[in-house]
Curated annotation (Swiss-Prot):
It comes from the Bacteria. This is Putative NADH dehydrogenase/NAD(P)H nitroreductase SGR_2476. Its EC number is 1.-.-.-. Gene3D superfamilies: NADH Oxidase. Keywords: Flavoprotein, FMN, NAD, NADP, Oxidoreductase. GO terms for molecular function: oxidoreductase activity. Belongs to the nitroreductase family. HadB/RutE subfamily. Its cofactor is FMN.
Amino acid sequence: MSLVLDPAAQDLLFREARTANTFTDEPVTDEQVQAIYDLVKFGPTAFNQSPLRVVLVRSAEGRERLVQHMAEGNRPKTATAPLVAILAADNEFHEELPALLPHFPQAKDLFFSERPVRESAAGLNAALQAAYFIIGVRAAGLAAGPMTGYDAAGIQKEFLDDDHTPLMVVNIGKPGDDAWFPRSPRLSFDEVITTV
């Protein structure tokens, strides 16, 4: 069976896309980032929570502050990527629910009045949105280098607040020389899918 999405687009988004480890010097513009967001914001989340928040680290001072919280192996590529984004979950996302879920505004208090419930929901749904974000970066013809090797408490203190939990740091740009590691294997259909 063939998919509706053009094979070239399938390759761009999935089969040929890889995590980039080096980048060219070509800048990533605010217009590109807005185009990415304006596409991926339509990806589904439970109750339309939309808890993902993004901090773009553009300044040299901000980059220096960020690099010190990255794992040693992630520091050089984070220091040199054209753009770095900190993706975080907003644990107070429920405050936006009356606007985001106008047909069911009572969901804010009915389901999300307790902080632990919000943190769990925000983490799950922001991670889902982070995946959309990576696909959106690829759709813009750019490469993404998502990383979870960092001091989460340090990044939270430096760039966020107690209501925002860092999920990942993503380097963004045009891939540079030797950007890719060899493609790692994937599990087969039969290893993943069961039918009952």
